[in-house]
Amino acid sequence: MSQPDLIAEVLKKARTIAVVGLSGNPLRPSHGVTAYMQSHGYRIIPVNPQIDECLGEKAYASLLDVPEKIDIVNIFRKPEFVEEVVDQAIQLKVPAIWMQEEVIHEKAAEKARQAGIFVVMDLCILKEHRARLR
């Protein structure tokens, strides 16, 4: 299966997306992208230690604090913070990690792949959703 087909399959199967680095500021890209995904039926779990809630959902300080199954970890953090997030996703056995545009960390991506996790890197989940699931 091609990468675009795999992306479409992951987006079709996913129900719950944990968004690491989700901002409570509606002007930030993470907020707009996440609001779009929520409006298309995905359960959103904000992961940001600096907020209590976002988009009507309780926020958690880290992935390890999330009490439910996560289908996709969507990362809106600078690359230097990605490896810790990936390590937590591996620990939780999350099936997919999505690093947004300009979030590139080859070492962390390879570590996730070695753990059997599907990885998308340097792509916007909103743009891919629009392109693949019309």
Model-derived features with residue positions:
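Glycine-rich, highly charged phosphate/nucleotide-binding loops
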Residues: 1-3, 53-68, 72-84
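NAD(P)-binding Rossmann-fold cofactor-contacting core
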Residues: 23-28, 34-55
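Short acidic, glycine/proline-enriched helix-loop-strand junctions
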Residues: 67, 106-127
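Conserved beta-strand elements of the Class I
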Residues: 17-20
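ADP-ribose/adenylate-binding Rossmann-like module
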Residues: 89-112
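Short N-terminal or domain-adjacent regulatory/targeting segments
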Residues: 1-13
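A charged, well-structured terminal subsegment
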Residues: 128-134
